[in-house]
Amino acid sequence: MVLRPLVPAQCLGWLPLLGGLAVRDALTPLVEDLPWRVGTKWPNDVVALPDDPAAVPAVPGWAGTRKIAGVLSELVMPEAAAGGVARVLAPDMVPADRDEAPMVILGVGVNIGQAAEELPVPWAGSLRTLGAVGTGSGPDPKDAVEIVLTAIGHHLARLVGQWEEVGGNVDASGGALGRRLREALTTLGKQVSVQAPDGELGGLAVDVTPALVLRTQAGDTEVRAGDVTLVRMEG
């Protein structure tokens, strides 16, 4: 999907989380009668969490959580027309129109019809392994592809529209969008370890800005990229 949202460039970091929320909203109806719920995981995963963690084999760093989808984004800055000069916007400026706005290529991958033995890692899951498709009660995996794609497009358009209405600030106008993002984010409130580009950091995940805010013994710090795993607390 190609998006040119009318928000300041400094707010574009929210887009992968918004994309994850759109996927979560699209998949939730498919599992509503199953012992699973769908959430997001910072920075760009969509996961299924079991109602009864003891009923699912635990995977180190993931417990009973299973990754069922992921969101990737790539930023492309606007180019000048032939013979012209591209206008450079300040990070806090809203583009006047979509031609002036940076282009964000959003890629979404959803595990739909894979059997357990077809999944690449122990912490992966699919709509099939959750029991949402191909079980007789749910849609056929081929039909589910169209259902999921249509729903993701619908929810993403709605969320991006709400995001534009608040000028890219998810905590503006009462903060309803920010609350939804945080409520869906399963990372918050957990002791985690982040393998960041500059090393490993551990702490309590307390917020997103959209960077992940970790509370450590040295104070709060923001992590802008990295792989997150759960830390098992002893005792």
PLM regions and their residue ranges:
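Structural signature of FAD isoalloxazine-binding scaffolds in flavoprotein oxidoreductases
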Residues: 1-2
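Long, positively charged amphipathic alpha-helical accessory segments at protein N-termini or as interdomain linkers
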Residues: 7-9, 13-37, 48-235
